[in-house]
């Protein structure tokens, strides 16, 4: 039987990661017992993937319009607006 080591994206721990149910789309969720963060490896919704927020901010800073950013990234225009609106808050 093959064993895959999954590390926490928040604290990088590998020994305290346990399975924590499934998402509504049926993807496996994981829980880190050290920092209590939950995550999943597969995403159904494109805007939930790690790095999406930073890509949206980078495209806005480089002069790409909101509609063009939404079309290129494959997310809705309201998602772009929400990310830009919340970019002043710490993430």
From Swiss-Prot:
Entry's family note: Belongs to the IS1 elements InsA family.
One Pfam family here: Zn_ribbon_InsA
Designated name of the protein: Insertion element IS1 protein InsA
Known function: Absolutely required for transposition of IS1.
GO biological process: DNA transposition
Keywords on record: DNA recombination, Plasmid, Transposable element, Transposition
InterPro entries found in the cross-reference section: InsA_HTH_dom (IPR024431), InsA_N_dom_Znf (IPR003220), IS1_transposase_InsA (IPR051252)
Leader peptide range in chain numbering: none
């Amino acid at each position: 039987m093959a064993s895959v080591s999954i590390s926490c994206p928040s604290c990088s721990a590998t020994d305290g990661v346990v399975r924590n149910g499934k998402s509504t789309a049926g993807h496996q969720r994981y829980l880190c017992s050290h920092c209590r963060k939950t995550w999943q490896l597969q995403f159904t919704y494109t805007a939930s993937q790690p790095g999406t927020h930073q890509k949206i901010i980078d495209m806005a800073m480089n002069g790409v319009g909101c509609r063009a950013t939404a079309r290129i990234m494959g997310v809705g225009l309201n998602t772009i607006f929400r990310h830009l609106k919340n970019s002043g808050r710490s993430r």
